[in-house]
Structures are given as structure tokens and as C-alpha cells.
């Protein structure tokens, strides 16, 4: 059952329980959406103050109700490399919630561990067609996975994946490479095991473990390990292209940057199945830069701030704009922000605090008409990860698309 938060129907009081639609039991908002969309709703069963009541609708009448915010499942694991576990105090409150809920995986692409999933959940996922899902696998070795997740249920990963696939669910997997733990021989085995579940496993993303100054027990992926991992994964990628007509396994951009190797061409990424996981973002950015042409003159002086990881690509954008003569030399600067909040091992733009941006801007001797911040550095409310805001009318948070960014500058 699910509670109605608001109703425009006089016959349905607020805070009423919604029990069923057309005799289909409703357990949460997903079932409400599923059955309300797929059927021509004629009747619902509600309960208010212990009294059940059936409400009948006319053929052309729509249900005008809003449901209460659902309660999502929390993670039951205790991974040493968990970014949320290592967060300091004083950040945005929502950042501290460790979700591990298949509904959020389906709705917004959050990765889940499958350690809290039941047979009923799997059947329900199949019935509601909640596909695709995103799963953090890391390793298919049951003993090692139990140790990594510190959860006795973690060893059932291959069984859970197979059951979901049997219920016609497609899955995108993630492997976090932890030096000395999930790399090398173990990575080889994990990719091999997951590939046996193709096409149910649609893609495998391989990403380096994140390390901050608040998480000291995990070693960073070195340049040498990045190079070895690229060699291993690209062999699988070539093999899968021949066998399955798709690369299937893809490396995070960070591996190539760490290794000092070129970013693969767009064909490598196929339809970019794990773009939001930092896999293929650099290539799309590079191609957008190359596609820039006939850009109108940009007047004024601009500063683009970024994390160290993206610095080479934004410098490439600067050179392109100067080459097109749409901006005068010296009128645009690109600067990497040192991440003092999490430590300089954190180089992605989305994890730069408001305090670090303020510190960097205050040190700039040159005067700028516009200061461009990365698109991922604030939430929808304009707040940085440290819950701060910046009041400076020169600041523009960059759009994700380069052409839209250029429009902001003109």
C-alpha cells in the first residue's frame, strides 16, 4: 500500500492509503505508475481511518493524486572504499544517505549491490519491467566479494544477475579496480564470468577506485597499473567486438589520463552505455571542440575553472577558440582548482567544494568579466558539495554542451 499526499479529488481525502488500482495491489509509487499507465483506470480501492472505500471513475476521467515521498532502502554493506562513509561533516544532507535500492537504479541509474535483494524483489522487477538496472559487481569471486562488501550475502552475485536476466532485465555492471584486490587476475576472471551472461549483461564499466584524504586505507591506481589495466581490458574489448559485435567492456576516461594515453575514438564507446559513469565523456568533449566552427566574436575576459582531470581538455577548447579567432589571445584563461577539501587525489570537477572555488577566485589578480564553473559542481539549488553558495554575478555554471557554453560567453 502507498499513502496519498495530495488529491484534487473531493472523494479522496489527503493522507488516504491507496490499496489497489483495478484490483491490482499497489505497494509503492512504481506500481502506481505502472498500472495507472498500462490500464484504463476505472476504480481504485482506498482506506482512510480504517474504512475501505472503492472509488469509480468515468471512462475519460483521470486520477488526480500525488503520492507521498517513498522511503528508499539503505545500503547494508561496509566497503572500505565507500565514498559516502568517508565524507566529512557539514556537506549537503542528502549526500550522507547510502541508497541501495533497485527503484533508484531503474529511475536514475544509481548502482546497487544486490546484497539486499530477495526472490520476491527479482520477480517484481521482472513484472514491472524495471530495465535496465545498474549493478556494482567489483568481483565475481564469492569469497572476495563477501570480504570487500563485508556482507555474507555478497557472494551470490552471479546467481542474482542470472535470475534478473531470466526475468528479461538488462544490466549494466561496474567494476571498481582496487590495487592488489580487484585488479589483474581477478579482473580477468570477473570480466570473463560476466561476459557469459551476454546479452543480459549489456555493458561492463571498469573504473579506478576513488581515494580522498578522508579514506587513507586504499591505495591509488598508479600510472603503471592504469597501463596494465588498459592492456587487459582492451584485449577483452576486441574479443567481444568479434564475438558479440559490441565492445561490451569499457574503461573510465581516468585510466587513459592516468596512463598518459590517447582517449579512444567515439566508435570504441558504441552508444556510450556508461557515459554518466565517466566513460566516454572526454571523447564527446573532444569531438564537440573539433566540431566548433564559424563561432561569433566573444568579447570580454573569461576564466574557466575546472578539476585537474579535465584541465587538458579545457585547454584544448581554449586553443580552438583562439585558432578560430573568436576570442583574442590572453582573454580566456583555464585554471585547475586544487581540491583541499577532499585532497588533491580527487581530480574530478563535480567534487570541488564551494570553499575551494572561492579560495581560487580570490587569489586571481587578473579581473574577469565572466567566471565559468563546471556543470557538475552544484545541485539544482545551486549549492556546492559543502552546502555553500557563491554570490558573484560574474559566475556562470557551464552547460554540459560546448555550443551552449559559447552562447553564454557571447
What is the predicted function of each stretch?
Residues 1-8, 34-35, 45-47, 53-69:
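PDZ/PDZ-like peptide-tail recognition elements
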Residues 4, 9-27:
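Conserved PDZ fold ligand-binding element
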Residues 15-18, 44, 82:
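Terminal peptide-recognition signature
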Residues 20-45:
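PDZ domains, with a preference for the canonical peptide-binding region formed by the helix
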Residues 50-52, 58-172, 176-200, 210-236:
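Conserved Radical SAM active-site core
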Residues 132-134, 170-172, 203-205, 248-250, ...:
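Structural preference for beta-strand elements that scaffold enzyme active sites
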Residues 145, 180-181, 201-225, 244-267, ...:
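Flexible glycine/acidic-rich beta-alpha junction loops that bind and position SAM and/or redox cofactors
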Residues 260-410:
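Radical SAM enzyme core and accessory elements
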Amino acid at each position: 500500500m502507498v499513502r496519498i499526499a495530495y488529491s484534487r479529488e473531493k472523494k479522496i481525502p489527503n493522507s488516504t492509503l491507496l490499496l489497489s488500482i483495478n484490483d491490482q495491489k499497489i505497494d509503492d509509487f512504481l506500481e502506481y505508475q505502472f498500472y495507472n499507465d498500462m490500464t484504463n483506470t476505472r476504480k481504485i480501492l482506498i482506506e482512510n481511518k480504517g474504512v475501505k472505500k472503492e472509488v469509480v471513475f468515468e471512462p475519460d476521467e483521470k486520477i488526480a493524486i500525488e503520492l507521498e515521498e517513498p522511503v528508499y532502502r539503505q545500503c547494508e554493506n561496509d566497503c572500505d572504499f565507500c565514498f559516502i562513509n568517508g565524507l566529512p561533516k557539514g556537506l549537503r544532507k542528502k549526500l550522507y544517505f547510502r541508497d541501495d535500492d533497485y527503484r533508484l537504479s531503474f529511475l536514475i541509474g544509481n548502482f546497487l549491490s544486490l546484497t539486499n535483494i530477495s526472490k520476491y524483489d527479482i520477480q517484481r522487477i521482472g513484472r514491472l519491467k524495471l530495465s535496465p538496472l545498474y549493478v556494482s559487481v567489483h568481483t565475481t569471486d564469492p569469497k572476495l566479494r563477501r570480504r570487500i562488501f563485508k556482507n555474507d550475502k555478497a557472494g551470490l552475485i552471479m546467481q542474482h544477475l542470472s535470475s534478473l536476466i531470466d526475468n528479461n532485465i538488462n544490466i549494466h555492471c561496474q567494476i571498481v579496480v582496487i590495487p592488489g584486490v580487484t585488479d589483474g587476475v581477478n579482473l580477468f576472471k570477473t570480466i570473463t564470468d560476466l561476459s557469459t551472461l551476454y546479452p543480459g549483461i549489456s555493458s561492463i564499466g571498469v573504473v579506478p577506485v576513488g581515494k580522498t584524504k578522508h579514506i587513507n586505507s586504499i591505495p591509488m591506481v598508479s600510472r603503471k597499473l592504469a597501463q596494465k589495466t588498459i592492456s587487459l581490458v582492451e584485449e577483452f574489448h576486441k574479443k567481444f567486438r568479434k564475438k558479440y559485435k559490441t565492445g561490451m567492456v569499457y574503461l573510465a576516461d581516468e585510466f587513459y589520463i592516468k596512463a598518459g594515453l590517447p582517449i579512444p575514438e567515439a566508435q570504441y564507446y558504441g552508444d556510450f552505455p556508461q557515459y554518466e559513469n565517466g566513460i566516454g565523456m572526454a571523447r564527446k568533449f573532444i569531438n564537440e571542440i573539433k566540431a566548433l566552427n564559424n563561432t561569433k566574436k566573444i568579447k570580454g575576459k573569461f576564466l574557466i575553472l575546472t578539476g585537474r582531470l579535465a584541465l587538458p581538455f579545457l585547454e584544448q577548447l581554449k586553443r580552438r577558440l583562439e585558432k578560430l579567432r573568436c576570442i583574442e589571445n590572453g582573454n580566456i584563461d583555464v585554471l585547475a582548482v586544487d581540491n583541499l577539501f577532499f585532497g588533491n587525489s580527487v581530480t574530478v570537477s563535480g567534487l570541488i567544494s564551494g570553499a575551494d572555488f572561492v579560495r581560487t577566485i580570490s587569489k586571481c589578480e587578473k579581473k574577469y568579466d565572466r567566471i565559468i564553473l563546471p556543470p557538475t559542481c552544484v545541485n539544482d539549488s545551486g549549492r556546492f558539495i559543502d552546502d555553500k553558495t557563491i554570490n558573484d554575478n560574474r559566475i556562470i555554471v557551464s552547460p554540459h554542451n560546448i555550443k551552449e557554453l559559447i552562447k553564454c560567453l557571447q
